[in-house]
Amino acid sequence: MKGILGKKVGMSQLFTTEGIAISVSIIEVPENIVTKIITKEKNSYNAIQLAAFDKKQSRFLKPEIGHFAKANTKPKRFIKEFRDFQGYKLGQTVDVSIFSPGEFVDVTGTSKGKGFAGTIKRYNQAIGPRSHGGGGGSKPIRQTGSLGDISGNKVVKGMTMPGRLGHEKVTKQSLEIIKVDKENNLLVLKGSVPGPKKSFLVIKSAIKKPNPKNPVSLFVPNSDKEVKNE
């Protein structure tokens, strides 16, 4: 099991040797620091705490500064706990080289917030009839409709109603690693990842392994060689 913290840079595209364009997400993955070791003897489970992206020390309280000082590192902005991770030491660095092209990962982040939205946009409900008494503006066409049986005297839990859309924890599963750039600390994944640019992401080894398929052969300009993800 592998895991690391990163930040979304944006999206781009790469071309295969057959000329097919592949949409890719570029993720910045700096050196992660192990800032805490959690053992089963003390906390009833095994885990490690990773931290990344420096932040001004003046923004932290003294106990927080002392927590990072134990790992001999500067205060970090993004901190996450990874369960069932063993074999790490306090203060150890983890970088993008733990992954290799062809592997599959799960990426967790916070989706883009879209503000207040109605049920048609939020839950993909159908629009009401525009004739036979359903006209008269957008209200009767786009309204929520029935909220349940009147004898219950309540709105049942889970009823689809208008509210805030987006800004939720989302996980994209089984994304293929197309390229690992160790020099620039970048990870290139096939497809999209949650959240806007500069949003923080948690990257872990994929739980659901996809069916084996042919590796992606990338086209490299000014070169006769193929780059295969094996």
Curated annotation (Swiss-Prot):
Annotated stretches, region: Disordered: 125-149, 210-230
Species this chain originates from: Mesomycoplasma hyopneumoniae (strain 232) (Mycoplasma hyopneumoniae)
Subunit note: Part of the 50S ribosomal subunit. Forms a cluster with proteins L14 and L19.
Record key words, sorted: Ribonucleoprotein, Ribosomal protein, RNA-binding, rRNA-binding
GO biological process assignments: translation
InterPro entries: Ribosomal_uL3 (IPR000597), Ribosomal_uL3_bac/org-type (IPR019927), Ribosomal_uL3_CS (IPR019926), Transl_B-barrel_sf (IPR009000)
Sequence similarity: Belongs to the universal ribosomal protein uL3 family.
Protein name (Swiss-Prot/TrEMBL): Large ribosomal subunit protein uL3
Task of the protein: One of the primary rRNA binding proteins, it binds directly near the 3'-end of the 23S rRNA, where it nucleates assembly of the 50S subunit.
GO molecular function: rRNA binding; structural constituent of ribosome
GO cellular component, one term: cytosolic large ribosomal subunit
Gene that this polypeptide is encoded by: rplC
Superkingdom, taxonomy of origin: Bacteria
